[in-house]
């Protein structure tokens, strides 16, 4: 059946249930280039989301969920942070949140932290004093784009990243100032907000690149935003093209250093069996299975790679009307992890990892691969 056999009233359902994982374009659809039809389904859905946003705006809940910087700043304030985290763990209060904001009571919400990552690293001085070694692709010193998630919700992840990189003689600093990369607003269809965030981040990142720093971000979606989506939105912007070439996924960067013989491979602790979920927005960057290749350097470590979408998306798994669908999507991954019975499980995407934890239940949280690498180094 072609699209002409679908009721037009159902078009919006398709748009609503596409959360731009990009996997159809990368792994499923036979009509992508070089096919003459040149179908780019994710960006077709993005266009529909943008039109819908222009015409109708967004509901209050969705504006709140995608205002990650504003929510993060408020929720991470002293005293407020304790109240927010307690409320997120309270079944009665989550029930109220479900009835009022339509945020599903069973969806795991990320914790907030005080101090934030940027507060903790405000006066950071790199622990490595070794001479910087430049390779064909890397400058050997890295400015961390913390991301709103790394700053407010998962500072320990970013701190682990700093430890691992400095253990490999890579000086680290923070990007001087940053806003959310824009991915939440992008998926909402609010492209004007994406453009505003891009202008702020572009100047900040170019400042670091001009000073000889590479850029690394701990969240795949944020890296993808700068590598793919913003350059596609603004193809004539030379600064964004420069950023695209100088921003890296953490394990992509570590692999490039390893290829040049510069990775520390003196590991102190085996990791055993690791159920590793390959994040969608990392896979579509097309730089290979670098996380797997680096972790497999650790002796007595076996990786079981799972390449399926977790169904989280940042907001899809949280919203009342789509949470149950998201849990159906993650179910095959959960069953695979249960069958493996690993020593550790996790994903490069911390939000996807939360979805795995929600599906598995229990008290054993996921571990990010960069945190596993820190453990393997004995740091």
Language model features with spans:
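Residues immediately within or flanking Cys/His clusters that coordinate Zn2+
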Residues: 15-21, 26, 178, 277, ...
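Residue-level signal for mature regions of secreted extracellular proteins and peptides
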Residues: 11-17, 22, 174, 273, ...
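Short, non-ligating residues that shape and space the ligands of small metal-coordination modules
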Residues: 27, 35-38
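Generic internal hydrophobic packing segments that stabilize the cores of diverse globular domains
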Residues: 11-15, 26, 41-45
